[in-house]
């Protein structure tokens, strides 16, 4: 007679377990749905921050579950699959940190650790203020706007400024490149009192190099002073 205990749940036990925890499961799934669907930097920074935390937790959770699967495999085939998936999860997680650290060294922005993208936009205003923003890819054109004295780019609130504060060049950094955008067009309203209420600027991609933002200086001042 075997001394091992059979821990397999039958159908009735599974149904009973679901009935006991269905409210928690519903609330948890609703929370994830709201976070993933409405978590955009252009909508709510609070929900977006929660979304980033959830995404950060997914890789360690995947690795932990993979390790458990390796320790308690259902069979030999399951063990091989668990090892492959766990190694893939570990390599992906390490690769994320390597790329994020490289990007952080280039632009010195905490947006570098955004798990949704691999690029950070940067605008150094002529008043010395540094504005960084999340961007999903490296576009050919960037169009920041000023509305009611507030600077927006890619739909994100950046800072309060005047049209004269926009620089000639802005940047989009990736782990291995610095993309330089040159101002090619600007519109600062009409001759009425709307001049300071609305302005739009067009920056076209000018060149690409491997420099860091620390090498950029405006008026003899370091970028981070």
Swiss-Prot record:
<keyword id="KW-0812">Transmembrane</keyword>
<comment type="similarity">
    <text>Belongs to the gammacoronaviruses M protein family.</text>
</comment>
<feature type="topological domain" description="Virion surface">
    <location>
        <begin position="1"/>
        <end position="20"/>
    </location>
</feature>
<protein>
    <recommendedName>
        <fullName>Membrane protein</fullName>
    </recommendedName>
</protein>
<keyword id="KW-1040">Host Golgi apparatus</keyword>
<feature type="glycosylation site" description="N-linked (GlcNAc...) asparagine; by host">
    <location>
        <position position="6"/>
    </location>
</feature>
<keyword id="KW-0946">Virion</keyword>
<comment type="subunit">
    <text>Homomultimer. Interacts with envelope E protein in the budding compartment of the host cell, which is located between endoplasmic reticulum and the Golgi complex. Forms a complex with HE and S proteins. Interacts with nucleocapsid N protein. This interaction probably participates in RNA packaging into the virus.</text>
</comment>
<dbReference type="GO" id="GO:0039660">
    <property type="term" value="F:structural constituent of virion"/>
</dbReference>
<dbReference type="InterPro" id="IPR002574">
    <property type="entry name" value="M_CoV"/>
</dbReference>
<keyword id="KW-0472">Membrane</keyword>
<feature type="topological domain" description="Intravirion">
    <location>
        <begin position="42"/>
        <end position="51"/>
    </location>
</feature>
<feature type="topological domain" description="Virion surface">
    <location>
        <begin position="73"/>
        <end position="77"/>
    </location>
</feature>
<feature type="transmembrane region" description="Helical">
    <location>
        <begin position="52"/>
        <end position="72"/>
    </location>
</feature>
<dbReference type="GO" id="GO:0044178">
    <property type="term" value="C:host cell Golgi membrane"/>
</dbReference>
<keyword id="KW-1133">Transmembrane helix</keyword>
<dbReference type="InterPro" id="IPR042550">
    <property type="entry name" value="GAMMA_CORONA_M"/>
</dbReference>
<feature type="glycosylation site" description="N-linked (GlcNAc...) asparagine; by host">
    <location>
        <position position="3"/>
    </location>
</feature>
<feature type="transmembrane region" description="Helical">
    <location>
        <begin position="78"/>
        <end position="98"/>
    </location>
</feature>
<keyword id="KW-0468">Viral matrix protein</keyword>
<keyword id="KW-1043">Host membrane</keyword>
<dbReference type="Pfam" id="PF01635">
    <property type="entry name" value="CoV_M"/>
</dbReference>
<dbReference type="GO" id="GO:0055036">
    <property type="term" value="C:virion membrane"/>
</dbReference>
<dbReference type="GO" id="GO:0019031">
    <property type="term" value="C:viral envelope"/>
</dbReference>
<keyword id="KW-0325">Glycoprotein</keyword>
<comment type="function">
    <text>Component of the viral envelope that plays a central role in virus morphogenesis and assembly via its interactions with other viral proteins.</text>
</comment>
<keyword id="KW-0261">Viral envelope protein</keyword>
<feature type="transmembrane region" description="Helical">
    <location>
        <begin position="21"/>
        <end position="41"/>
    </location>
</feature>
<feature type="topological domain" description="Intravirion">
    <location>
        <begin position="99"/>
        <end position="225"/>
    </location>
</feature>
<dbReference type="GO" id="GO:0016020">
    <property type="term" value="C:membrane"/>
</dbReference>
